[in-house]
């Protein structure tokens, strides 16, 4: 008979004896437990607002399905962004072991890292547009900013952030040498975004560009995106018509230059034809002298001298002919360029005129106030924004202009903003190249070493609304987009380019921006009216989500999530603003007085 000590157990077990205490370790089914309990609640919130359904409705990926549906793999990656996973490899550790979390996001189970990467590499520009449709649909339904009255200006900050890669990298598309702060000889991509800060914390969208690109190259696309999300600002038809007339006048000037170049080409051809005729005469004379030298050997020497004279003149004509041909080619290129500029200006004038005459439906405009750094403070940008009806405060592009303006300000005109900064209105001066009268506010900053530097602000805000000092302080409030850059770069890890494919990286960028807005909406829905109202997204992702929870289904129509009572975030979430259990979903109503400071 077999000894009981030799019987194999059906349950794996390990023990450790320490003095009189035995520590026992076994394996058990933990499918009901998750370590990110509030991420479960976010999955339910996403289901409520239709986020998974929107992905399945708008995005169509043709990929052979073996274990996972392609959209399920895309949603798995999206959840990893919300969870703050820095790399796709984190999915296997942070998400895949928790089936209850997957079910909260309407997924049978989370896909693995390899499956997610395969789907990301299959994305095309059509899929990027489809993800943009998901973004637009959810933004229209859930945006906090869009609930503001249309006559209250929405403050939109625009900025660019560099996504650096290794200088030796050759496999990241669009990764080029460019300007990246605090580094030299760096490669990467440029990410430009439009962001609404204050109590909203919503990114309207953004674009990727090669490392050498400037934000001015992306500004037309950003303006189109802003108006798509928020509707158009009230356009200034009179300014647009004036702009169209200026463009038409410039087009006529370029057309006149093109006609002048073409006339010069005709003149050069006439001169060339005359020189060629003279060159033929000299060639004929040389041929005749050569024949006479053969017939009259005694006069060959004198004939050779005359022949050399004709040959020298022939060489001179040929040199002039080559110079004329080069001049004709240069004039032809200039004429082509003038015609191209003429066509472009006429097309732009036509578009501006159409925009000026296009009727705007009542109630479809919104006041939009743009803030931007010196990258946007060019004459063309200022003119464009003014004509399209935007309010704006921009930092001037050229510091030399600031130094020139400093000579025009009297000592009594300076107003103190703080102990290191003073400002003054520059009266009677226009921005060079801009046909409109705008406010120029000169700022003088003194650092700790008593070094003085100047910059200036350009704005169309009336001085009655924002005084000199108030305008400077208002511009300095654009630090909110700097905080956004840190969050999307270092919390949602947009800086970690997941692939070398630009299309996949573009799709990742869109989903990261959508994840940012979803976190903002979730924070408002979960914590409005609680001590954690206005919780920073960094704190929410890195601390707030990390609540141990158990998910059960006591009834087919009841899902219960038990959150750890030791977590203050769980306590605030469950208690709700009225301190009652079973708090229904909060309406997304913007409260401009948050209880907590935001990063």
PLM segments and residue spans:
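Electropositive, glycine- and tryptophan-enriched low-complexity nucleic-acid-binding patches
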Residues: 180-260, 264-267, 271-274, 278-281, ...
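Basic, short loop/linker segments at the boundary and entry of helix-turn-helix/winged-helix-like folds
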Residues: 32-76
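Active-site-proximal, Lys/Arg-enriched surface segment
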Residues: 119-196, 285, 292
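Short amphipathic alpha-helical "interface-anchor" segments enriched in bulky aromatics
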Residues: 45, 91, 96, 376, ...
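An anionic, glycine-rich sequence signature occurring as long contiguous blocks
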Residues: 11-21, 25, 234, 238, ...
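Short, positively charged, Gly/Tyr-enriched micro-motifs
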Residues: 64-143, 149-151, 196-203, 213, ...
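A short, flexible helix-boundary coil/loop motif
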Residues: 243, 518-599
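Short, solvent-exposed helix-loop connector elements
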Residues: 58-65, 467-475, 491-507, 523-536, ...
């Amino acid at each position: 008979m077999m000894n009981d000590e030799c019987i194999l157990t059906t349950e794996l077990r390990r023990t450790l004896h320490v003095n009189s205490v035995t520590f026992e370790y076994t394996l058990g089914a933990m499918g009901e437990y998750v370590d990110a309990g509030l991420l479960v609640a976010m999955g339910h919130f996403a289901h409520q607002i239709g986020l998974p359904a929107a992905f399945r409705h708008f995005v169509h990926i043709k990929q052979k399905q073996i274990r996972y549906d392609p959209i399920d793999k895309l949603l798995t990656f999206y959840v990893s962004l919300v969870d703050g996973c820095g790399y796709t490899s984190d999915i296997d550790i942070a998400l895949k072991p928790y089936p209850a979390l997957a079910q909260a996001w309407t997924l049978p189970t989370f896909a693995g890292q390899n499956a997610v990467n395969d789907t990301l590499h299959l994305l095309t520009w059509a899929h990027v547009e489809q993800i943009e449709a998901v973004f637009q649909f959810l933004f229209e339904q859930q945006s906090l900013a869009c609930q503001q009255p249309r006559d209250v200006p929405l403050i939109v900050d625009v900025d660019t952030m560099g996504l650096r890669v290794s200088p030796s990298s050759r496999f990241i598309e669009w990764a080029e040498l460019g300007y990246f702060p605090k580094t030299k000889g760096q490669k990467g991509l440029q990410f430009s975004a439009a962001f609404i800060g204050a109590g909203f914390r919503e990114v309207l969208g953004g674009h990727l560009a090669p490392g050498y690109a400037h934000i001015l190259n992306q500004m037309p696309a950003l303006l189109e995106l802003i108006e798509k999300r928020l509707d158009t600002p009230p356009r200034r038809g009179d300014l647009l018509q004036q702009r169209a007339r200026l463009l038409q006048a410039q087009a006529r000037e370029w057309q006149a230059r093109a006609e002048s170049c073409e006339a010069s080409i005709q003149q050069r051809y006439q001169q060339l034809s005359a020189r060629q005729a003279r060159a033929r005469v000299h060639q004929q004379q040389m041929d005749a002298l050569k024949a006479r030298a053969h017939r009259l050997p005694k006069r060959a020497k004198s004939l050779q001298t005359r022949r050399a004279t004709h040959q020298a003149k022939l060489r001179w004509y040929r040199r002039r002919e080559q110079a004329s041909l080069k001049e004709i080619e240069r004039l032809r290129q200039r004429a082509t360029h003038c015609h191209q500029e003429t066509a472009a200006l006429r097309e732009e004038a036509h578009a501006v005129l159409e925009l000026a005459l296009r009727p705007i439906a009542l109630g479809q405009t919104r006041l939009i106030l743009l803030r931007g750094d010196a990258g946007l403070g060019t004459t063309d940008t200022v003119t464009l924004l003014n004509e399209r009806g935007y309010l704006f405060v921009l930092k001037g592009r050229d510091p030399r202009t600031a130094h020139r303006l400093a000579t025009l300000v009297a000592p009594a005109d300076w107003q103190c903003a703080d102990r290191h900064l003073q400002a003054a209105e520059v009266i009677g001066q226009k921005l060079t190249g801009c046909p409109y009268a705008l406010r120029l506010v000169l700022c003088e900053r003194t650092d700790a070493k008593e070094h003085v530097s100047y910059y200036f602000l350009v704005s169309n805000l009336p001085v009655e609304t924002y005084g000199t000092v108030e305008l400077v302080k208002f511009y300095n409030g654009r630090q909110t987009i700097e905080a956004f850059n840190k969050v999307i770069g270092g919390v949602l890890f947009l800086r970690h380019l997941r692939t070398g494919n630009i299309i996949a990286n573009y799709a990742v960028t869109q989903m990261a921006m959508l994840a940012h807005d979803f976190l903002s909406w979730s924070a408002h829905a979960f914590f409005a009216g609680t001590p954690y109202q206005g919780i920073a997204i960094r704190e929410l992702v890195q601390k707030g989500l990390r609540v141990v929870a158990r998910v059960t289904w006591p009834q087919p129509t009841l899902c219960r999530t038990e959150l750890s009572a030791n977590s203050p975030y769980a306590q605030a979430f469950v208690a709700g603003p009225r301190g009652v259990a079973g708090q229904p979903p909060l309406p997304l109503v913007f409260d401009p007085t948050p209880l907590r400071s935001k990063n």
